[in-house]
Design a protein with these regions (language model features):
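Conserved acidic donor-binding segment of nucleotide-sugar-dependent glycosyltransferases
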Residues: 296-298, 302-309, 317-323
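Short His-centered aromatic/hydrophobic patch
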Residues: 91-97, 115
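A conserved, positively charged/aromatic
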Residues: 105, 111-141, 153-154
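Aromatic "clamp/platform" in nucleotide-sugar-dependent glycosyltransferases that forms part
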Residues: 244, 263
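Donor nucleotide-sugar binding/catalytic pocket of nucleotide-sugar-dependent glycosyltransferases
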Residues: 135-171, 185
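A conserved mid-protein helix/loop that constitutes part of the nucleotide-sugar donor-binding site
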Residues: 18-23, 181, 188-209, 221-228, ...
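Short hydrophobic beta-strand element within catalytic cores of glycosyltransferases
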Residues: 280-285
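N-terminal strand-loop element at the rim of the active site
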Residues: 2, 7-15, 19-68, 152, ...
Length: 359
């Protein structure tokens, strides 16, 4: 009998979690599974490509007052999961996890929830509800030990930690030529990414290293605020908001340094990808521990405290003034492409899903 699996996420708009769940669905389809991708929002938007053999199910919006909508939404999701005939449904992100648990109560379908960022932020205002409901999920996937430790022992004991796979064109050989005098970062322009600190730190750094430029790839709600900051600091000729980029590997491959200044992160794909390309990297040591899981401070990158502009300036100056140190960090970082190879990560997912299904 053909194996069947369902995935549930609010939408397929651009984002790290959306990319991972789409690639997981595509992998299982390629392995011969019958795959359903169930979404509940943004039906007209799909940033990432799904395999033609993945069935896309967009849930109709519930009607009625606020209370009725809650119950009708659960009923609609329950029917979609039942219609998929999947013995296991894997859900990603916040409320989708909680809805999947509630929608499958007293069904034979087993639920694996996946937390993709700091749980305290992902479930802000719903912390007690999440900790309670997660006990009824048959499995849970976290990206870091810090995220897993947020939940009670009943959840931790049936969970696993699975990192993100390295996808796309980031497994290419490290660039060995003369590097461009560019500092780069990749991520949506959102307050949690704290690009303000990066821009302010770069403006200070630039006073002593005027040949360097900062390129920020990504777009989002914070763009206007960042443009105003760039104007305020009079660094419009050295700081560039490049917008979304379809060829990130090409854009950053020859850069001298990658910097991540987030206040919180799950497992930061952008940092993993920059490391795999062999770039020297700096990251904040932010919750829920994703950067610290990737970077061994001083060996394959540098970690700095969250929000510490002075530490960032010092780290940038150290790496870009000590070529041997930068070379060491970059070559050590490049090993990430072996550790996070897609075939390894997908097999770990498949093994865990099979284990949960067989419990």
């Amino acid at each position: 009998m053909r194996k069947t699996i369902a995935f549930h996420i609010p939408s397929l708009i651009g984002g790290g979690a959306e990319r991972v769940i789409c690639n997981l669905a595509n992998h299982f389809a390629e392995e011969g599974y019958r795959v359903s991708m169930i979404t509940s929002e943004m039906e007209d938007h799909q940033y990432y490509q799904l395999d033609e053999h993945v069935t896309r199910v967009v849930l109709p919006k519930p009607t009625g007052n606020r209370i009725l909508k809650i119950f009708r939404r659960l009923g609609i999701l329950r029917k979609a999961i039942r219609d998929s005939e999947a013995p296991v449904v894997v859900s990603f992100i916040g409320m989708a996890n909680l809805r999947a648990i509630l929608a499958t109560r007293f069904m034979k379908t087993k639920v694996i929830v996946s937390v993709r960022s700091a749980p305290g932020r992902e479930y802000k205002g719903k912390e007690k509800l999440a900790k309670f409901l997660f006990r009824f999920a048959e499995g849970a996937v976290f990206q870091t030990g810090m995220a897993r430790d947020y939940f009670p022992g009943t959840v931790r004991r049936k969970s696993t930690i699975l990192m993100n796979p390295l996808l796309g064109d980031f497994s290419r050989a490290r660039y060995e030529g003369q590097r461009e005098k560019e500092i780069v970062t990749v991520g949506r322009l959102h307050p949690v990414k704290n690009h303000e600190m990066l821009i302010r730190a770069f403006a200070r750094f630039h006073q002593d290293y005027p040949d360097y430029v900062l390129r920020i790839y990504g777009d989002g709600e914070n763009r206007t605020k960042l443009e105003e900051l760039i104007q305020e600091l009079a660094c419009g000729e050295s700081v560039f908001l490049e917008g979304n980029c379809d060829a990130v590997a090409d854009a950053i491959w020859k850069a001298s340094l990658f910097v991540l200044t987030s206040n919180t992160e799950g497992m930061p794909n952008a940092l993993l990808e920059a490391m795999a390309l062999g770039l020297p990297c700096i990251s904040t040591d932010c919750p829920c521990g994703g950067p610290a899981a990737l970077i061994r401070d001083g060996e394959n990158g540098l970690l700095i405290p969250v929000g510490d502009e002075d530490a960032l300036v010092d780290a940038m100056e150290r790496i870009l003034s000590e070529k041997d140190f930068a070379e060491k960090l970059g070559r050590s970082a490049e090993q990430a492409k072996e550790q996070y190879a897609p075939e390894k990560i997908y097999q770990m997912w498949e093994d865990y899903i099979t284990e949960v299904a067989d419990r």
